[in-house]
Swiss-Prot record:
UniProt cross-references to Pfam families, sorted A to Z: CAF1C_H4-bd, WD40
SMART domains in UniProt: WD40 (SM00320)
Modified residues (N-acetylalanine): 2
Protein name: Histone-binding protein RBBP4
Gene transcribed to yield this protein: RBBP4
Length: 425
């Protein structure tokens, strides 16, 4: 009986999702300056823009690159580098180019040929997460379904993978007992990599100190303060010895690598009422960070007084799995997760007065809801070179590259012609 009910609920939910997506598609010309929808061969659990951009002479587009992965059903997995052509501001831009069938829009007409897979490298199992090293973006670390963290220099691998499926990482980092997701390169110390694991620990490696012939590197330090699965870890962006971690024990911990005590963090705070899945330090303000949780909220913190939560962002309907500050605006952050939505928030609008109609759509700090995905969003990344451009990937193989309409983040349109959900006002 329960099975029948579940099947009925699933069918109803699918109908609702499809209806919502139709409405979203109809409204994209008003909500976005750019939407590119691309179906990957396999879903990617990870997405990160590489820092480089090419601007070909005489062309009306620039070329950007992304690090992706695969999550296959028992077939060979790959670490993937893809290129994306984004239209320049002066590209022929016309809302009538919107292709309602494809859900693509933004000057370009069709996206075919605008997104290409450039490099595929054999990988052991799915790529839980892949992140490039800031000091040398050719070097990419990956989290696997095993306890190993792998490091690849993609310039040393052919762009077409060996058909044997053999995975040959340049380094294999040991120290964990289980898999995980969290991964963070130190932006101030080249080669210092942190990883979070289901085994309740955080490992630190220094790959700059690796002997030339050694392929296996043991963790330099293992941090053991959490009492449950560690979901995410992140270096502070300015202080080379500080990092934060979050876990299923509902805690946010701040660590200092100069401390001799690897089982006790400098600070530990009960951050949420459920598992904490992600964290992000603000790139402009050295004391500010955000955490995202299974309690459906994003919390804002000040390192100078962690006893007090600065703010709680509430609008998500389900678990939050990723939170990232904008690289271009210190008050802007985004969050995504199981509810298929990516929310963009603006701290500067906290506490603003709202009409009752506006309040129904969400709090004043909720700037935009990206409603283009019809499955859980696994990861997203702000483009470092094009403000307001985001790449998001979902569990149903869909990758979207999009940019909200300028009148939404530039307050020149006080009337607010369209509300953030895209239902029109």
């Amino acid at each position: 009986m329960a099975d029948k009910e579940a099947a009925f609920d699933d069918a109803v939910e699918e109908r609702v999702i499809n209806e919502e997506h139709k409405i979203w598609k109809k409204n994209t010309p008003f909500l976005y300056d750019l939407v590119m929808t691309h179906a990957l061969e396999w879903p990617s659990l990870t997405a990160q823009w590489l820092p480089d951009v090419t601007r070909p002479e005489g062309k009306d587009f620039s070329i950007h690159r992304l690090v992706l992965g695969t999550h296959t059903s028992d077939e060979q997995n790959h670490l993937v580098i893809a290129s994306v052509q984004l239209p320049n501001d002066d590209a022929q831009f016309d809302a009538s180019h919107y292709d309602s069938e494809k859900g693509e829009f933004g000057g370009f007409g069709s996206v075919s040929g605008k997104i290409e897979i450039e490099i595929k490298i054999n990988h052991e199992g799915e790529v839980n997460r892949a992140r490039y090293m800031p000091q040398n973006p050719c070097i990419i670390a990956t989290k696997t379904p095993s306890s190993d963290v792998l490091v690849f220099d993609y310039t040393k691998h052919p762009s077409k993978p060996d058909p044997s499926g053999e995975c040959n990482p340049d380094l294999r980092l040991r120290g964990h007992q289980k898999e995980g997701y969290g991964l963070s390169w130190n932006p101030n110390l080249s080669g210092h990599l942190l990883s979070a694991s289901d085994d309740h620990t955080i490992c630190l490696w220094d790959i700059s100190a690796v002997p030339k012939e050694g392929k296996v590197v043991d963790a330099k330090t293992i941090f053991t303060g959490h009492t449950a699965v560690v979901e995410d870890v992140s270096w502070h962006l300015l202080h080379e010895s500080l990092f934060g971690s979050v876990a299923d024990d509902q805690k946010l911990m701040i660590w200092d690598t100069r401390s001799n005590n690897t089982s006790k963090p400098s600070h530990s705070v009960d951050a949420h009422t459920a598992e904490v899945n992600c964290l992000s330090f603000n790139p402009y303000s050295e004391f500010i960070l955000a955490t995202g949780s299974a309690d459906k909220t994003v919390a804002l913190w000040d390192l100078r007084n962690l006893k007090l939560k600065l703010h709680s962002f509430e609008s998500h309907k389900d678990e939050i799995f990723q939170v990232q500050w904008s690289p271009h605006n210190e008050t802007i952050l985004a969050s995504s997760g199981t509810d298929r939505r990516l929310n963009v928030w603006d701290l500067s609008k906290i506490g603003e007065e709202q009409s009752p109609e506006d309040a129904e759509d969400g709090p004043p700090e909720l700037l935009f809801i990206h409603g283009g995905h019809t499955a859980k969003i696994s990861d997203f990344s702000w483009n470092p070179n094009e403000p307001w451009v985001i790449c998001s990937v979902s569990e149903d193989n869909i990758m979207q590259v999009w940019q909200m309409a300028e009148n939404i983040y530039n307050d020149e349109d006080p009337e607010g012609s369209v509300d953030p959900e895209g239902q029109g006002s």
